[in-house]
Amino acid sequence: MANEQNEQAQDIQNEQVEQSNEQTQAEGVEQANDVTVESLQAQITKLEENLKLEKARTANAVYEAQKSVERIQRESEKHKETVLEKFAKELLDSVDNLERAIQAAGDEETPVLEGVKLTLKSLLTTLEKFGVVEADTQNGFNADLHQAVGIDPNAKANEIGTVLQKGYTLNGRLLRPAMVMVGQ
């Protein structure tokens, strides 16, 4: 009987220990849950901040890339214009030489002269395709388009009397001024 009472006492004590352990575990789980939720919320907040930062960096990188592309395109266009301008200026010497050859040939039409005229016409057509056109010398002297190199006594004031060398523009910009004699 004493053994039975000891066993019952021990069973009661074991139950109390188990209940105490369960209670402690439950409290620990609740605390763990509280800590876990708080730490997870902190992690979420931190990750959201990192995401915002990375989005801003990405947007900035995209913006910088677009600006670089635009800058490169502008520089490329400017370089293309510069190269075209240099090339056109060099071709104008050939145009001048062909015009001098036609003037030197006189009035007699020969097959060679006809060939030179066709070559000049072809060259001028090609130049026009790329925006090179002859500067206007019919509407009076314009300091933006013409370079006065002398006075023509037969011309009226501010009128162009003689054109010594034709001028040309490239896409509206002066490529070479016309060398002219102007009236007084």
From Swiss-Prot:
Residues 1-26 have a biased composition (Polar residues). GO terms for biological process: protein folding. One of its GO terms (cellular component) is cytosol. InterPro entries: GrpE, GrpE_coiled_coil, GrpE_head. It comes from the Bacteria. It is found in: Cytoplasm. Residues 1-34 are annotated as: Disordered. Transmembrane segments: none annotated. One of its GO terms (molecular function) is adenyl-nucleotide exchange factor activity. Its main location: cytoplasm. CDD domains: GrpE. The keyword Iron does not apply. Pfam families: GrpE (PF01025). Keywords: Chaperone, Cytoplasm, Stress response. Participates actively in the response to hyperosmotic and heat shock by preventing the aggregation of stress-denatured proteins, in association with DnaK and GrpE. It is the nucleotide exchange factor for DnaK and may function as a thermosensor. Unfolded proteins bind initially to DnaJ; upon interaction with the DnaJ-bound protein, DnaK hydrolyzes its bound ATP, resulting in the formation of a stable complex. GrpE releases ADP from DnaK; ATP binding to DnaK triggers the release of the substrate protein, thus completing the reaction cycle. Belongs to the GrpE family. Homodimer. This is Protein GrpE. The gene is grpE.
